[in-house]
Protein backbone atom coordinates (compact mmCIF):
# COMPACT_ATOMS: atom_id res chain seq x y z
CA UNK A 1 0.00 0.00 0.00
CA UNK A 2 1.40 3.41 -0.95
CA UNK A 3 2.20 6.04 1.66
CA UNK A 4 -0.59 8.32 0.38
CA UNK A 5 -3.10 5.47 0.69
CA UNK A 6 -1.91 4.60 4.21
CA UNK A 7 -2.15 8.23 5.27
CA UNK A 8 -5.69 8.47 3.93
CA UNK A 9 -6.83 5.28 5.73
CA UNK A 10 -5.30 6.47 9.03
CA UNK A 11 -7.04 9.80 8.70
CA UNK A 12 -10.41 8.14 8.19
CA UNK A 13 -9.95 5.79 11.18
CA UNK A 14 -9.11 8.72 13.46
CA UNK A 15 -12.18 10.62 12.24
CA UNK A 16 -14.42 7.61 12.97
CA UNK A 17 -12.97 7.19 16.48
CA UNK A 18 -13.41 10.88 17.22
CA UNK A 19 -17.02 10.71 16.05
CA UNK A 20 -17.72 7.71 18.30
CA UNK A 21 -16.20 9.56 21.26
CA UNK A 22 -18.42 12.58 20.64
CA UNK A 23 -21.45 10.31 20.37
CA UNK A 24 -20.66 8.63 23.70
CA UNK A 25 -19.87 11.92 25.41
CA UNK A 26 -23.03 13.78 24.42
CA UNK A 27 -25.70 11.15 23.91
CA UNK A 28 -24.91 7.92 25.77
CA UNK A 29 -25.60 7.64 29.53
CA UNK A 30 -22.55 7.34 31.77
CA UNK A 31 -21.45 3.83 32.68
CA UNK A 32 -21.24 4.71 36.39
CA UNK A 33 -23.57 6.79 38.57
CA UNK A 34 -22.18 10.23 39.25
CA UNK A 35 -22.03 11.30 42.95
CA UNK A 36 -24.58 13.83 44.17
CA UNK A 37 -23.23 17.36 44.61
CA UNK A 38 -24.27 18.83 47.96
CA UNK A 39 -23.98 22.37 49.21
CA UNK A 40 -21.85 22.93 52.28
CA UNK A 41 -24.91 23.80 54.43
CA UNK A 42 -26.76 20.64 53.32
CA UNK A 43 -23.66 18.63 54.17
CA UNK A 44 -23.57 20.15 57.69
CA UNK A 45 -27.26 19.30 58.19
CA UNK A 46 -26.61 15.70 57.15
CA UNK A 47 -23.61 15.62 59.47
CA UNK A 48 -25.71 16.80 62.45
CA UNK A 49 -28.35 14.18 61.65
CA UNK A 50 -25.56 11.55 61.64
CA UNK A 51 -26.42 10.44 58.11
CA UNK A 52 -22.76 10.67 56.90
CA UNK A 53 -20.84 7.40 57.05
CA UNK A 54 -17.37 8.28 55.66
CA UNK A 55 -15.52 11.26 54.22
CA UNK A 56 -12.34 11.70 52.14
CA UNK A 57 -10.89 15.21 51.91
CA UNK A 58 -8.77 16.03 48.82
CA UNK A 59 -7.64 19.66 48.74
CA UNK A 60 -10.87 21.72 48.76
CA UNK A 61 -13.20 18.82 47.82
CA UNK A 62 -14.84 16.37 50.22
CA UNK A 63 -16.07 13.05 48.83
CA UNK A 64 -18.16 10.78 51.02
CA UNK A 65 -20.92 8.23 51.48
CA UNK A 66 -24.22 8.46 53.28
CA UNK A 67 -25.37 5.77 55.68
CA UNK A 68 -27.54 4.36 52.91
CA UNK A 69 -24.54 4.06 50.51
CA UNK A 70 -25.30 7.16 48.42
CA UNK A 71 -22.12 8.95 47.22
CA UNK A 72 -21.81 12.72 47.35
CA UNK A 73 -19.28 15.50 46.88
CA UNK A 74 -18.97 18.85 48.62
CA UNK A 75 -16.85 21.84 47.69
CA UNK A 76 -15.40 23.18 50.93
CA UNK A 77 -15.41 26.93 51.55
CA UNK A 78 -12.21 28.74 52.65
CA UNK A 79 -13.60 29.18 56.20
CA UNK A 80 -14.28 25.47 56.80
CA UNK A 81 -12.18 25.47 59.96
CA UNK A 82 -13.15 22.95 62.61
CA UNK A 83 -14.49 20.48 60.05
CA UNK A 84 -12.26 17.70 61.37
CA UNK A 85 -13.66 18.11 64.90
CA UNK A 86 -17.26 18.00 63.63
CA UNK A 87 -16.57 14.84 61.64
CA UNK A 88 -14.98 13.21 64.65
CA UNK A 89 -17.91 14.18 66.92
CA UNK A 90 -20.35 12.70 64.39
CA UNK A 91 -18.40 9.45 64.33
CA UNK A 92 -17.57 9.72 60.62
CA UNK A 93 -14.64 7.73 59.25
CA UNK A 94 -12.37 10.35 57.67
CA UNK A 95 -9.22 10.44 55.54
CA UNK A 96 -7.11 13.27 54.16
CA UNK A 97 -5.27 12.93 50.83
CA UNK A 98 -2.84 15.30 49.10
CA UNK A 99 -3.02 15.34 45.28
CA UNK A 100 0.43 14.99 43.80
CA UNK A 101 0.74 15.93 40.11
CA UNK A 102 3.22 13.72 38.16
CA UNK A 103 6.21 15.52 36.70
CA UNK A 104 5.23 14.60 33.14
CA UNK A 105 1.81 16.19 33.57
CA UNK A 106 3.51 19.46 34.53
CA UNK A 107 5.85 19.21 31.53
CA UNK A 108 3.21 18.10 29.00
CA UNK A 109 1.75 21.57 28.14
CA UNK A 110 5.22 22.91 27.39
CA UNK A 111 6.08 19.93 25.18
CA UNK A 112 2.78 20.18 23.31
CA UNK A 113 3.26 23.91 22.77
CA UNK A 114 6.76 23.35 21.36
CA UNK A 115 5.51 20.54 19.09
CA UNK A 116 2.73 22.74 17.72
CA UNK A 117 5.18 25.59 17.02
CA UNK A 118 7.67 23.28 15.27
CA UNK A 119 4.87 21.76 13.18
CA UNK A 120 3.56 25.16 12.14
CA UNK A 121 7.05 26.31 11.21
CA UNK A 122 7.69 23.21 9.08
CA UNK A 123 4.30 23.53 7.41
CA UNK A 124 4.93 27.20 6.58
CA UNK A 125 8.34 26.38 5.10
CA UNK A 126 6.86 23.61 2.96
CA UNK A 127 4.09 25.88 1.69
CA UNK A 128 6.56 28.62 0.86
CA UNK A 129 8.89 26.23 -0.94
CA UNK A 130 6.03 24.80 -2.97
CA UNK A 131 4.75 28.24 -3.92
CA UNK A 132 8.11 29.33 -5.33
CA UNK A 133 9.13 26.02 -6.89
CA UNK A 134 11.89 25.35 -4.36
CA UNK A 135 10.78 21.89 -3.27
CA UNK A 136 13.35 19.25 -3.98
CA UNK A 137 12.22 16.78 -6.57
CA UNK A 138 14.22 13.59 -6.65
CA UNK A 139 14.38 12.20 -10.16
CA UNK A 140 13.53 8.51 -10.08
CA UNK A 141 15.10 6.44 -12.85
CA UNK A 142 13.20 4.00 -14.99
CA UNK A 143 14.59 0.67 -13.82
CA UNK A 144 16.15 -1.81 -16.28
CA UNK A 145 13.47 -3.78 -18.06
CA UNK A 146 10.72 -1.25 -17.28
CA UNK A 147 11.02 0.52 -20.64
CA UNK A 148 8.76 -1.36 -23.06
CA UNK A 149 10.25 0.44 -26.09
CA UNK A 150 12.97 -1.20 -28.19
CA UNK A 151 14.45 -0.56 -31.62
CA UNK A 152 11.76 -2.85 -33.04
CA UNK A 153 9.22 -0.15 -32.17
CA UNK A 154 11.20 2.53 -34.02
CA UNK A 155 10.66 2.45 -37.77
CA UNK A 156 11.81 4.60 -40.66
CA UNK A 157 15.11 5.68 -39.06
CA UNK A 158 17.63 2.97 -39.92
CA UNK A 159 20.59 5.38 -40.13
CA UNK A 160 19.80 6.94 -36.76
CA UNK A 161 19.35 3.52 -35.13
CA UNK A 162 22.71 2.47 -36.55
CA UNK A 163 24.39 5.41 -34.81
CA UNK A 164 22.71 4.61 -31.51
CA UNK A 165 23.44 0.88 -31.62
CA UNK A 166 27.05 1.69 -30.71
CA UNK A 167 25.85 3.36 -27.52
CA UNK A 168 23.78 0.29 -26.68
CA UNK A 169 26.70 -2.02 -27.39
CA UNK A 170 28.98 0.03 -25.14
CA UNK A 171 26.50 -0.10 -22.25
CA UNK A 172 26.18 -3.87 -22.69
CA UNK A 173 29.83 -4.69 -23.41
CA UNK A 174 32.09 -1.89 -22.17
CA UNK A 175 35.14 -4.14 -21.75
CA UNK A 176 35.87 -4.52 -25.45
CA UNK A 177 35.92 -0.74 -25.87
CA UNK A 178 38.22 -0.32 -22.89
CA UNK A 179 40.56 -3.02 -24.21
CA UNK A 180 41.20 -1.15 -27.44
CA UNK A 181 41.28 2.26 -25.74
CA UNK A 182 38.16 3.62 -27.42
CA UNK A 183 36.28 6.42 -25.71
CA UNK A 184 32.53 6.26 -26.17
CA UNK A 185 30.82 9.65 -26.62
CA UNK A 186 29.76 11.21 -23.34
CA UNK A 187 26.81 12.97 -24.91
CA UNK A 188 24.46 12.31 -27.82
CA UNK A 189 22.32 15.17 -29.16
CA UNK A 190 19.22 14.31 -31.19
CA UNK A 191 17.89 17.29 -33.12
CA UNK A 192 15.08 17.72 -35.59
CA UNK A 193 11.51 18.95 -36.02
CA UNK A 194 8.83 18.11 -33.44
CA UNK A 195 7.23 14.69 -33.70
CA UNK A 196 10.10 12.92 -35.47
CA UNK A 197 10.71 10.46 -32.61
CA UNK A 198 13.65 11.85 -30.65
CA UNK A 199 12.22 10.92 -27.25
CA UNK A 200 11.14 7.53 -28.61
CA UNK A 201 14.71 6.85 -29.74
CA UNK A 202 16.09 7.67 -26.28
CA UNK A 203 13.62 5.28 -24.64
CA UNK A 204 14.48 2.62 -27.20
CA UNK A 205 18.18 2.94 -26.33
CA UNK A 206 17.32 2.46 -22.64
CA UNK A 207 15.10 -0.52 -23.45
CA UNK A 208 17.75 -2.18 -25.60
CA UNK A 209 20.63 -1.57 -23.20
CA UNK A 210 18.72 -2.63 -20.07
CA UNK A 211 20.13 0.16 -17.87
CA UNK A 212 18.46 2.77 -15.60
CA UNK A 213 16.97 5.67 -17.55
CA UNK A 214 16.70 9.19 -16.09
CA UNK A 215 14.32 11.38 -18.12
CA UNK A 216 13.39 15.00 -17.48
CA UNK A 217 12.77 18.25 -19.33
CA UNK A 218 15.25 21.08 -19.66
CA UNK A 219 12.67 23.54 -18.35
CA UNK A 220 12.56 21.69 -15.00
CA UNK A 221 16.08 22.97 -14.23
CA UNK A 222 15.32 26.68 -14.59
CA UNK A 223 13.72 28.13 -11.46
CA UNK A 224 12.83 31.57 -10.14
CA UNK A 225 15.71 31.83 -7.68
CA UNK A 226 19.36 31.69 -8.67
CA UNK A 227 21.10 28.47 -7.72
CA UNK A 228 18.14 26.09 -7.66
CA UNK A 229 18.72 24.85 -11.21
CA UNK A 230 22.42 24.22 -10.58
CA UNK A 231 21.51 22.32 -7.42
CA UNK A 232 19.14 20.09 -9.36
CA UNK A 233 21.82 19.38 -11.96
CA UNK A 234 24.24 18.29 -9.21
CA UNK A 235 21.56 16.10 -7.64
CA UNK A 236 20.73 14.50 -11.00
CA UNK A 237 24.30 13.57 -11.84
CA UNK A 238 24.99 12.37 -8.30
CA UNK A 239 22.12 9.89 -8.70
CA UNK A 240 23.34 8.95 -12.18
CA UNK A 241 26.79 8.04 -10.86
CA UNK A 242 25.24 5.87 -8.16
CA UNK A 243 23.19 4.02 -10.80
CA UNK A 244 25.91 3.74 -13.47
CA UNK A 245 25.86 2.44 -16.11
CA UNK A 246 22.80 4.49 -17.01
CA UNK A 247 21.33 7.01 -19.43
CA UNK A 248 20.43 10.61 -18.57
CA UNK A 249 17.95 12.04 -21.09
CA UNK A 250 17.22 15.80 -21.14
CA UNK A 251 14.32 16.70 -23.41
CA UNK A 252 14.07 20.23 -24.87
CA UNK A 253 17.60 21.04 -23.73
CA UNK A 254 17.43 24.42 -25.46
CA UNK A 255 15.41 25.64 -22.45
CA UNK A 256 18.60 25.52 -20.38
CA UNK A 257 21.36 25.29 -22.99
CA UNK A 258 20.86 28.50 -24.98
CA UNK A 259 23.82 30.68 -25.81
CA UNK A 260 25.15 32.74 -22.93
CA UNK A 261 25.98 36.41 -22.79
CA UNK A 262 23.05 38.09 -24.54
CA UNK A 263 22.07 41.30 -22.80
CA UNK A 264 18.63 41.19 -24.41
CA UNK A 265 17.43 38.45 -22.13
CA UNK A 266 15.31 39.80 -19.29
CA UNK A 267 14.51 37.71 -16.20
CA UNK A 268 15.97 34.33 -15.36
CA UNK A 269 19.23 35.15 -17.17
CA UNK A 270 21.62 34.51 -14.25
CA UNK A 271 19.76 31.39 -13.16
CA UNK A 272 19.84 29.84 -16.64
CA UNK A 273 23.52 30.62 -17.11
CA UNK A 274 24.45 29.16 -13.73
CA UNK A 275 22.45 26.04 -14.53
CA UNK A 276 24.18 25.70 -17.91
CA UNK A 277 27.60 26.21 -16.30
CA UNK A 278 26.84 23.46 -13.79
CA UNK A 279 25.72 21.14 -16.60
CA UNK A 280 28.97 21.78 -18.47
CA UNK A 281 30.97 21.11 -15.30
CA UNK A 282 29.15 17.85 -14.60
CA UNK A 283 29.68 16.58 -18.15
CA UNK A 284 33.39 17.30 -17.75
CA UNK A 285 33.42 15.71 -14.29
CA UNK A 286 32.79 12.07 -15.14
CA UNK A 287 35.36 9.98 -16.92
CA UNK A 288 35.11 8.12 -20.17
CA UNK A 289 34.52 4.78 -18.44
CA UNK A 290 31.99 5.71 -15.77
CA UNK A 291 29.11 4.46 -17.90
CA UNK A 292 26.94 7.61 -17.73
CA UNK A 293 25.62 8.51 -21.18
CA UNK A 294 23.90 11.89 -21.54
CA UNK A 295 21.30 12.07 -24.30
CA UNK A 296 19.43 15.23 -25.19
CA UNK A 297 16.81 16.34 -27.70
CA UNK A 298 16.02 19.73 -29.18
CA UNK A 299 14.15 21.32 -32.05
CA UNK A 300 16.61 24.24 -32.20
CA UNK A 301 20.26 23.16 -32.30
CA UNK A 302 21.22 26.56 -33.72
CA UNK A 303 20.50 28.34 -30.41
CA UNK A 304 22.56 26.00 -28.21
CA UNK A 305 25.72 27.26 -26.55
CA UNK A 306 28.88 26.34 -28.44
CA UNK A 307 30.54 25.01 -25.28
CA UNK A 308 27.75 22.46 -24.97
CA UNK A 309 28.42 21.08 -28.45
CA UNK A 310 32.20 20.80 -28.34
CA UNK A 311 33.93 17.38 -28.40
CA UNK A 312 33.94 15.82 -24.96
CA UNK A 313 30.39 16.86 -24.18
CA UNK A 314 27.72 16.43 -26.85
CA UNK A 315 30.28 15.20 -29.34
CA UNK A 316 27.83 13.04 -31.31
CA UNK A 317 25.05 15.03 -32.95
CA UNK A 318 22.44 13.05 -34.86
CA UNK A 319 19.79 14.71 -37.06
CA UNK A 320 16.33 13.17 -36.81
CA UNK A 321 14.23 14.45 -39.69
CA UNK A 322 10.91 13.52 -41.25
CA UNK A 323 11.04 10.07 -42.88
CA UNK A 324 11.10 9.44 -46.61
CA UNK A 325 8.42 7.44 -48.43
CA UNK A 326 9.94 4.08 -47.46
CA UNK A 327 10.32 5.22 -43.86
CA UNK A 328 6.73 6.46 -43.75
CA UNK A 329 5.53 3.08 -44.96
CA UNK A 330 7.49 1.33 -42.20
CA UNK A 331 6.08 3.71 -39.58
CA UNK A 332 2.55 3.16 -40.87
CA UNK A 333 3.01 -0.61 -40.59
CA UNK A 334 4.21 -0.27 -36.99
CA UNK A 335 1.23 1.87 -35.99
CA UNK A 336 -1.17 -0.32 -37.98
CA UNK A 337 -0.52 -3.24 -35.62
CA UNK A 338 -3.68 -3.95 -33.66
CA UNK A 339 -5.86 -2.02 -36.13
CA UNK A 340 -8.28 -3.70 -38.52
CA UNK A 341 -7.32 -2.57 -42.03
CA UNK A 342 -9.29 -3.26 -45.18
CA UNK A 343 -7.39 -5.76 -47.39
CA UNK A 344 -7.48 -3.28 -50.27
CA UNK A 345 -5.79 -0.53 -48.24
CA UNK A 346 -2.33 0.15 -49.68
CA UNK A 347 -0.05 1.64 -47.01
CA UNK A 348 2.62 2.34 -49.63
CA UNK A 349 0.15 4.60 -51.45
CA UNK A 350 -0.69 6.32 -48.17
CA UNK A 351 3.03 6.89 -47.57
CA UNK A 352 3.41 8.48 -51.01
CA UNK A 353 0.51 10.84 -50.28
CA UNK A 354 1.94 12.08 -47.00
CA UNK A 355 5.31 13.77 -47.75
CA UNK A 356 6.60 15.80 -44.84
CA UNK A 357 4.56 13.86 -42.27
CA UNK A 358 6.48 12.94 -39.13
CA UNK A 359 6.08 9.76 -37.12
CA UNK A 360 3.70 11.52 -34.74
CA UNK A 361 1.63 12.78 -37.69
CA UNK A 362 1.35 9.27 -39.14
CA UNK A 363 0.37 7.78 -35.78
CA UNK A 364 -2.31 10.45 -35.42
CA UNK A 365 -3.43 9.82 -39.00
CA UNK A 366 -4.15 6.12 -38.40
CA UNK A 367 -5.79 6.84 -35.05
CA UNK A 368 -8.11 9.42 -36.63
CA UNK A 369 -8.94 6.94 -39.39
CA UNK A 370 -9.79 4.26 -36.81
CA UNK A 371 -12.08 6.66 -34.93
CA UNK A 372 -13.81 7.63 -38.18
CA UNK A 373 -14.35 3.95 -39.05
CA UNK A 374 -16.04 3.36 -35.69
CA UNK A 375 -18.16 6.48 -36.15
CA UNK A 376 -19.31 5.23 -39.54
CA UNK A 377 -20.13 1.78 -38.18
CA UNK A 378 -17.43 -0.05 -40.11
CA UNK A 379 -15.36 -2.98 -38.90
CA UNK A 380 -12.29 -2.09 -41.00
CA UNK A 381 -10.35 1.06 -41.88
CA UNK A 382 -10.75 1.85 -45.57
CA UNK A 383 -9.12 4.39 -47.88
CA UNK A 384 -12.11 6.66 -47.36
CA UNK A 385 -11.24 7.09 -43.68
CA UNK A 386 -7.57 7.60 -44.58
CA UNK A 387 -8.50 10.37 -47.04
CA UNK A 388 -10.66 12.09 -44.45
CA UNK A 389 -7.91 11.79 -41.82
CA UNK A 390 -5.34 13.32 -44.19
CA UNK A 391 -7.69 16.22 -44.85
CA UNK A 392 -8.11 16.74 -41.11
CA UNK A 393 -4.34 16.88 -40.58
CA UNK A 394 -3.70 19.14 -43.58
CA UNK A 395 -6.63 21.54 -43.18
CA UNK A 396 -6.81 21.41 -39.39
CA UNK A 397 -10.27 20.16 -38.55
CA UNK A 398 -13.33 18.15 -39.58
CA UNK A 399 -15.48 19.01 -42.56
CA UNK A 400 -18.30 21.44 -41.77
CA UNK A 401 -20.83 20.13 -44.25
CA UNK A 402 -23.78 21.47 -42.29
CA UNK A 403 -22.61 25.06 -42.50
CA UNK A 404 -24.96 27.29 -44.50
CA UNK A 405 -23.02 29.18 -47.20
CA UNK A 406 -24.44 31.88 -49.42
CA UNK A 407 -24.45 30.89 -53.14
CA UNK A 408 -22.23 33.81 -54.13
CA UNK A 409 -19.74 32.93 -51.38
CA UNK A 410 -19.71 29.28 -52.48
CA UNK A 411 -18.99 30.37 -56.06
CA UNK A 412 -16.16 32.63 -54.89
CA UNK A 413 -14.56 29.75 -52.97
CA UNK A 414 -14.91 27.52 -56.05
CA UNK A 415 -13.26 30.17 -58.23
CA UNK A 416 -10.45 30.62 -55.72
CA UNK A 417 -9.66 26.91 -55.35
CA UNK A 418 -10.04 26.30 -59.09
CA UNK A 419 -7.45 29.03 -59.67
CA UNK A 420 -4.99 27.23 -57.41
CA UNK A 421 -5.61 23.92 -59.18
CA UNK A 422 -5.31 25.38 -62.69
CA UNK A 423 -2.03 27.20 -62.00
CA UNK A 424 -0.54 24.15 -60.25
CA UNK A 425 -1.47 21.91 -63.19
CA UNK A 426 -0.30 24.21 -66.00
CA UNK A 427 2.90 25.54 -64.39
CA UNK A 428 6.07 23.49 -65.01
CA UNK A 429 7.84 22.52 -61.78
CA UNK A 430 4.75 22.84 -59.57
CA UNK A 431 3.66 19.97 -57.34
CA UNK A 432 0.79 17.95 -58.87
CA UNK A 433 -2.72 18.41 -57.51
CA UNK A 434 -3.98 15.56 -55.32
CA UNK A 435 -7.31 17.00 -54.26
CA UNK A 436 -9.37 20.18 -54.40
CA UNK A 437 -12.52 20.82 -52.35
CA UNK A 438 -14.83 23.67 -51.43
CA UNK A 439 -16.18 21.95 -48.31
CA UNK A 440 -15.34 24.19 -45.31
CA UNK A 441 -12.85 22.65 -42.92
CA UNK A 442 -11.31 24.36 -39.89
CA UNK A 443 -11.02 28.07 -40.65
CA UNK A 444 -10.72 27.49 -44.41
CA UNK A 445 -13.62 27.66 -46.84
CA UNK A 446 -11.86 25.05 -48.98
CA UNK A 447 -8.37 23.92 -49.91
CA UNK A 448 -6.22 22.56 -52.71
CA UNK A 449 -3.84 19.74 -51.77
CA UNK A 450 -0.64 19.45 -53.78
CA UNK A 451 2.13 16.97 -52.97
CA UNK A 452 5.43 16.25 -54.73
CA UNK A 453 5.72 12.99 -56.61
CA UNK A 454 8.93 12.13 -54.73
CA UNK A 455 10.62 13.29 -51.54
CA UNK A 456 12.73 16.34 -52.24
CA UNK A 457 15.52 17.96 -50.22
CA UNK A 458 16.63 20.76 -52.57
CA UNK A 459 14.57 23.29 -54.53
CA UNK A 460 15.63 25.40 -57.47
CA UNK A 461 14.58 28.99 -58.08
CA UNK A 462 12.12 27.92 -60.78
CA UNK A 463 10.52 25.37 -58.44
CA UNK A 464 10.10 27.96 -55.69
CA UNK A 465 8.62 30.43 -58.19
CA UNK A 466 6.19 27.70 -59.34
CA UNK A 467 5.11 27.28 -55.71
CA UNK A 468 4.59 31.04 -55.41
CA UNK A 469 2.51 31.07 -58.57
CA UNK A 470 0.27 28.32 -57.21
CA UNK A 471 -0.26 30.32 -54.01
CA UNK A 472 -1.18 33.45 -56.01
CA UNK A 473 -3.49 31.55 -58.39
CA UNK A 474 -6.58 31.79 -56.19
CA UNK A 475 -6.31 35.57 -55.81
CA UNK A 476 -5.76 36.06 -59.54
CA UNK A 477 -8.72 33.82 -60.44
CA UNK A 478 -11.04 35.86 -58.20
CA UNK A 479 -9.91 39.09 -59.84
CA UNK A 480 -10.27 37.73 -63.40
CA UNK A 481 -13.68 36.03 -63.04
CA UNK A 482 -15.31 38.06 -60.25
CA UNK A 483 -13.69 41.46 -60.70
CA UNK A 484 -12.36 41.97 -57.17
CA UNK A 485 -10.33 40.30 -54.45
CA UNK A 486 -11.54 38.91 -51.11
CA UNK A 487 -10.08 38.08 -47.72
CA UNK A 488 -9.90 34.40 -48.65
CA UNK A 489 -6.32 34.85 -49.88
CA UNK A 490 -4.99 35.91 -46.48
CA UNK A 491 -3.15 32.67 -45.72
CA UNK A 492 -1.93 32.36 -49.32
CA UNK A 493 -0.34 35.82 -49.16
CA UNK A 494 1.28 35.07 -45.81
CA UNK A 495 2.87 31.88 -47.10
CA UNK A 496 3.90 33.48 -50.40
CA UNK A 497 5.54 36.39 -48.58
CA UNK A 498 7.45 33.99 -46.35
CA UNK A 499 8.77 31.94 -49.29
CA UNK A 500 9.72 35.06 -51.27
CA UNK A 501 11.51 36.60 -48.28
CA UNK A 502 13.50 33.41 -47.70
CA UNK A 503 14.48 33.33 -51.39
CA UNK A 504 15.90 36.85 -51.16
CA UNK A 505 17.41 36.88 -47.65
CA UNK A 506 18.52 33.26 -47.11
CA UNK A 507 18.97 31.45 -50.42
CA UNK A 508 20.95 34.08 -52.34
CA UNK A 509 18.28 34.36 -55.09
CA UNK A 510 18.00 38.15 -54.99
CA UNK A 511 20.01 41.29 -55.69
CA UNK A 512 19.42 43.41 -52.57
CA UNK A 513 21.79 41.44 -50.32
CA UNK A 514 23.43 39.35 -53.03
CA UNK A 515 24.90 36.08 -51.85
CA UNK A 516 24.73 37.03 -48.19
CA UNK A 517 22.39 35.06 -45.94
CA UNK A 518 20.67 37.18 -43.30
CA UNK A 519 20.97 35.33 -39.96
CA UNK A 520 17.95 34.71 -37.80
CA UNK A 521 17.81 36.10 -34.27
CA UNK A 522 15.68 35.09 -31.31
CA UNK A 523 16.49 38.09 -29.14
CA UNK A 524 13.89 40.91 -29.13
CA UNK A 525 15.30 44.26 -30.14
CA UNK A 526 18.45 42.79 -31.74
CA UNK A 527 18.86 43.86 -35.39
CA UNK A 528 20.69 41.48 -37.70
CA UNK A 529 20.96 43.92 -40.63
CA UNK A 530 20.72 47.63 -41.30
CA UNK A 531 17.46 49.44 -41.97
CA UNK A 532 18.59 50.17 -45.53
CA UNK A 533 19.22 46.47 -46.21
CA UNK A 534 15.90 45.48 -44.65
CA UNK A 535 14.06 48.01 -46.81
CA UNK A 536 15.90 46.78 -49.92
CA UNK A 537 14.87 43.19 -49.14
CA UNK A 538 11.23 44.21 -48.70
CA UNK A 539 11.26 46.09 -52.02
CA UNK A 540 12.72 43.09 -53.83
CA UNK A 541 10.21 40.72 -52.21
CA UNK A 542 7.40 43.01 -53.37
CA UNK A 543 8.83 43.20 -56.89
CA UNK A 544 9.15 39.40 -57.09
CA UNK A 545 5.56 38.81 -55.98
CA UNK A 546 4.25 41.52 -58.35
CA UNK A 547 6.06 39.97 -61.33
CA UNK A 548 4.83 36.46 -60.56
CA UNK A 549 1.28 37.72 -60.01
CA UNK A 550 1.27 39.32 -63.47
CA UNK A 551 2.42 36.03 -65.00
CA UNK A 552 -0.26 34.09 -63.10
CA UNK A 553 -2.99 36.51 -64.19
CA UNK A 554 -1.87 36.23 -67.78
CA UNK A 555 -1.98 32.41 -67.54
CA UNK A 556 -5.52 32.49 -66.12
CA UNK A 557 -6.79 34.95 -68.74
CA UNK A 558 -5.35 32.73 -71.48
CA UNK A 559 -7.09 29.65 -70.02
CA UNK A 560 -10.28 31.39 -68.90
CA UNK A 561 -12.58 28.79 -70.50
CA UNK A 562 -10.78 25.92 -68.77
CA UNK A 563 -11.04 27.75 -65.47
CA UNK A 564 -14.79 28.27 -65.92
CA UNK A 565 -15.29 24.56 -66.70
CA UNK A 566 -13.33 23.61 -63.60
CA UNK A 567 -15.37 26.03 -61.47
CA UNK A 568 -18.66 24.57 -62.74
CA UNK A 569 -17.57 21.00 -62.03
CA UNK A 570 -16.18 21.88 -58.61
CA UNK A 571 -19.34 23.79 -57.63
CA UNK A 572 -21.46 20.81 -58.61
CA UNK A 573 -19.39 18.00 -57.01
CA UNK A 574 -17.69 20.03 -54.23
CA UNK A 575 -14.65 17.71 -54.20
CA UNK A 576 -12.40 16.65 -57.08
CA UNK A 577 -9.30 14.48 -57.03
CA UNK A 578 -6.18 15.16 -59.05
CA UNK A 579 -7.18 12.95 -61.98
CA UNK A 580 -10.52 14.78 -62.28
CA UNK A 581 -8.75 18.14 -62.37
CA UNK A 582 -6.31 17.03 -65.07
CA UNK A 583 -9.14 15.49 -67.14
CA UNK A 584 -11.21 18.68 -67.06
CA UNK A 585 -8.28 20.96 -67.89
CA UNK A 586 -7.12 18.74 -70.77
CA UNK A 587 -10.55 18.69 -72.43
Curated annotation (Swiss-Prot):
Tell me which stretches of the chain form a coiled coil: none
Annotated residues that bind ATP are located at 192-199
Q: Which residue positions are annotated as catalytic?
A: 417
Q: Where in the cell is it found?
A: Cell membrane
State the free-text cofactor note: Binds 1 zinc ion per subunit.
The record places the following residue ranges in the Extracellular compartment, namely: 34-102
Write the record's keywords in alphabetical order, separated by commas: ATP-binding, Cell membrane, Hydrolase, Membrane, Metal-binding, Metalloprotease, Nucleotide-binding, Protease, Transmembrane, Transmembrane helix, Zinc
* Cytoplasmic topological domain: 1-12, 124-587
GO CC annotation, single: plasma membrane
BP-aspect Gene Ontology terms: protein catabolic process; proteolysis
| EC number(s) reported in the record | 3.4.24.-
Binding site residues for Zn(2+): 416, 420, 492
Q: What Gene3D superfamilies does the entry give?
A: 1.10.8.60, 3.30.720.210, P-loop containing nucleotide triphosphate hydrolases (3.40.50.300), Peptidase M41 (1.20.58.760)
UniProt family annotation: In the central section; belongs to the AAA ATPase family. In the C-terminal section; belongs to the peptidase M41 family.
Query: How is the subunit organization of this protein annotated in UniProt?
Result: Homohexamer.
Q: Which PANTHER family match?
A: ATP-DEPENDENT ZINC METALLOPROTEASE YME1L1, METALLOPROTEASE M41 FTSH
Tell me the function of this protein. Answer: Acts as a processive, ATP-dependent zinc metallopeptidase for both cytoplasmic and membrane proteins. Plays a role in the quality control of integral membrane proteins.
- For this entry, the protein name equals ATP-dependent zinc metalloprotease FtsH 2
Its organism's taxonomic lineage begins at: Bacteria, Bacillati, Bacillota, Clostridia, Eubacteriales
Q: Which gene encodes it?
A: ftsH2
